[in-house]
From Swiss-Prot:
This is 2-hydroxy-6-oxononadienedioate/2-hydroxy-6-oxononatrienedioate hydrolase. It comes from Escherichia coli (strain K12). It is an enzyme of class 3 (hydrolase). The keyword Translocase does not apply. The gene is mhpC. GO terms for cellular component: cytoplasm. The keyword Hydrolase applies.
Amino acid sequence: MSYQPQTEAATSRFLNVEEAGKTLRIHFNDCGQGDETVVLLHGSGPGATGWANFSRNIDPLVEAGYRVILLDCPGWGKSDSVVNSGSRSDLNARILKSVVDQLDIAKIHLLGNSMGGHSSVAFTLKWPERVGKLVLMGGGTGGMSLFTPMPTEGIKRLNQLYRQPTIENLKLMMDIFVFDTSDLTDALFEARLNNMLSRRDHLENFVKSLEANPKQFPDFGPRLAEIKAQTLIVWGRNDRFVPMDAGLRLLSGIAGSELHIFRDCGHWAQWEHADAFNQLVLNFLARP
């Protein structure tokens, strides 16, 4: 039987998660039926979702025999909105823990982009026995850069878009999000804008969260040596959101890690270089 591509609608699921005395309705997509599970965690951009972030990576993983879970973190996509005054990544890690517990999944491989990478590190530090392998793209440490003034140009534009969610500000952010802007079609802009504006509560609560705690993503650098999982670090040479030296910091701190840098690539390696990225990840996951 020929492979049937996954669809967002057919794989859409919801679970209730208890967090800080409240019940949050959390959305995720559940794809494939493999013995090993790969969880994909998206970044923090306005309008981001698990499906939108990894649309070019889902089918190759499922075809290779993996079960794939795409989480909409609280405050994004179809999940409930929150005002968060603590560590955003620790919150995401707790939510993910509850989801995989309810799904009765003992161990997961984690693949995270930007905020998703930072949240993957948070999960691994808290529950190392639940993690197989780690793939960290354009995020994972927090902290300062040795070479780039912080906040970066990209983060400034991201925060501006949250405060003023217009098509003009979306294009300003996306223009430096990727290296080659020729793939940024009007249809992509329209879909992302619709995602943003359909959940204004997410936008407003992200701004409120920043006001409550400007440091949503703490510096995990001093604890990286605790990570024992085999780790693939992936960066874009031209990333203007999270500087490349953050990847070097991960490489230095995590003993069982390796770093792959894509040239002519911005903050979205899994999308900009999808074919090469997918093969890189599949080879990494298949290794003993």
